[in-house]
């Protein structure tokens, strides 16, 4: 295979230039011509090497950065895929998002409750405002520093919804915006072994009974305690009055009580029945109302009413003792069938402002007896005679009744 030889460069005519002396001189532009034999030998060696490389099966080696390329790529004009160059020329693809993620700090593995607890525990007074908690978290963790406005509402919601955080109002001498937040003392151990990565369980504050944990600086008054006590207490120092004995009031209509209660508890204060008070003479009403500070209808426990004597009311068994006398008030009922209440102790008169002293009661009884007619006077006189030989207390009561009778 004969290859065309490289053409010799044509010799250009030599230019004549004038010397400085004015003489024409010849300048050699091409220089010395190389030997033609040496050039021909080099061309033959290059052609032989080219033939040897073309006859080899497989890959054809080409000088392209020291990398062997397939033959078809050389004939086609170069590689179509840049990945076929090799590892030296392969550049790893890097996007802008990947580079930005590499620079962004990782999110801490702590919950918002753990972050708030960290902030409160590191403060000197163990309390912080919402802005102080956010400042601690932003300064401690760069992740939250970059996303500050987004998680502030989450901190606020966790403070309000979890019982382990307690709101403390500001003191008057410390003005400022926002209230303080602190930890409930019972929630100090809600994290396992002091690690903020895991909580034991959700803390729940126990609801206390209102007023149970607050000590009373002063004892409650006796009247207030008696109103709220379901059982009668020792307000007046006297035992509870028994129920009326069946048969003691034979003429009492069914559904009608012989006395009315002033208090829902067992009878301490007894009132006259409404029909009996309506039938009392007007003179007795004037005598009762004239006494200041007393109630006209307030009387100790009464047996059969004196003005009902004419209606055929049987006298109580055990003698002709009248149940509303001074003696029955001071000493109580002598027999079991009288139906009167037990006597009140002397301390009862000091505790009860509504009850009158025995002396004032005797005056009211005397006025009521004067209005009831002559039959009542005879009963009082007979009772005075029988009470002369009884106990000293009975004599005092009888004397009081007799004194009222003389005034009549």
Curated annotation (Swiss-Prot):
Output the Gene Ontology terms for molecular function: DNA-binding transcription factor activity, RNA polymerase II-specific; RNA polymerase II cis-regulatory region sequence-specific DNA binding
DNA-binding region, residue intervals: 107-201
User: Which coarse location class applies to the principal site listed for this UniProt protein?
Assistant: nucleus
Q: Where is this gene product found? A: Nucleus
Q: Where is the stretch described as Disordered?
A: 1-54, 71-104, 385-408
Show the ranges annotated as biased composition (Acidic residues). 30-45
- Record keywords, A-Z: DNA-binding, Nucleus, Transcription, Transcription regulation
Entry GO CC: chromatin; nucleus
**Is Cytoplasm there in the keyword field?**
no
Q: Which domain of life is it from?
A: Eukaryota
What Pfam families does this protein's entry cite? Forkhead
Biased composition of type Basic and acidic residues is found at: 1-29
Q: Which GO terms describe its biological process?
A: anatomical structure morphogenesis; cell differentiation; regulation of transcription by RNA polymerase II
Bias (Low complexity): 389-401
Kindly provide the name given to this protein in its UniProt entry. Answer: Forkhead box protein D4-like 1
């Amino acid at each position: 295979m004969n290859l065309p030889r490289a053409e010799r460069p044509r010799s250009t005519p030599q230019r004549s230039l004038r010397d400085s002396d004015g003489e024409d001189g010849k300048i050699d532009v091409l220089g010395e011509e190389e030997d033609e034999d040496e050039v021909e030998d080099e061309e033959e060696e290059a052609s032989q090497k080219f033939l040897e490389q073309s006859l080899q099966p497989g890959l054809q080696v080409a000088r392209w950065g020291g990398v062997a390329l397939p033959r078809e790529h050389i004939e086609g004009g170069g590689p179509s895929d840049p990945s076929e160059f090799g590892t030296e020329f392969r550049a790893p693809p890097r996007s802008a998002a990947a580079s930005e993620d590499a620079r962004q700090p990782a999110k801490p593995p702590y919950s918002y409750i753990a972050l708030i607890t960290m902030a409160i525990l590191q403060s000197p007074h163990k309390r912080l405002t919402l802005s102080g908690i956010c400042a601690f978290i932003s300064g401690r963790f760069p992740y939250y520093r970059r996303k500050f406005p987004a998680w502030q509402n989450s901190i606020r919601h966790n403070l309000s919804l979890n019982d382990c955080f307690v709101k403390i109002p500001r003191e008057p001498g410390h003005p400022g915006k926002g209230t303080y937040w602190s930890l409930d003392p019972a929630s100090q151990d809600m994290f396992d072994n002091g690690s903020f990565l895991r909580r034991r369980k959700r803390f729940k504050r126990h609801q206390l009974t209102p007023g149970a944990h607050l000590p009373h600086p002063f004892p409650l008054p006796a009247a207030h305690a008696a109103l709220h006590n379901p059982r009668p207490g020792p307000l007046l120092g006297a035992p509870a009055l028994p129920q009326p004995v069946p048969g003691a009031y034979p003429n009492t209509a069914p559904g009608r009580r012989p006395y009315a209660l002033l208090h829902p508890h067992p009878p301490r204060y007894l009132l006259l029945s409404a029909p009996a008070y309506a039938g009392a003479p007007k003179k007795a009403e004037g005598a009762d109302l004239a006494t200041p500070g007393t109630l006209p209808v307030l009387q100790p426990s009464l047996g059969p009413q004196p003005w009902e004597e004419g209606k055929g009311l049987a006298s109580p068994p055990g003698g002709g003792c009248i149940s509303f006398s001074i003696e029955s008030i001071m000493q109580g009922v002598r027999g079991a069938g009288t139906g009167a209440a037990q006597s009140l102790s002397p301390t009862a008169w000091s505790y009860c402002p509504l009850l009158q002293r025995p002396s004032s009661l005797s005056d009211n009884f005397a006025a009521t007896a004067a209005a009831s007619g002559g039959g009542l006077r005879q009963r009082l006189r007979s009772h005075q005679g029988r009470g002369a030989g009884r106990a000293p207390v009975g004599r005092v009561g009888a004397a009081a009744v007799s004194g009222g009778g003389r005034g009549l």
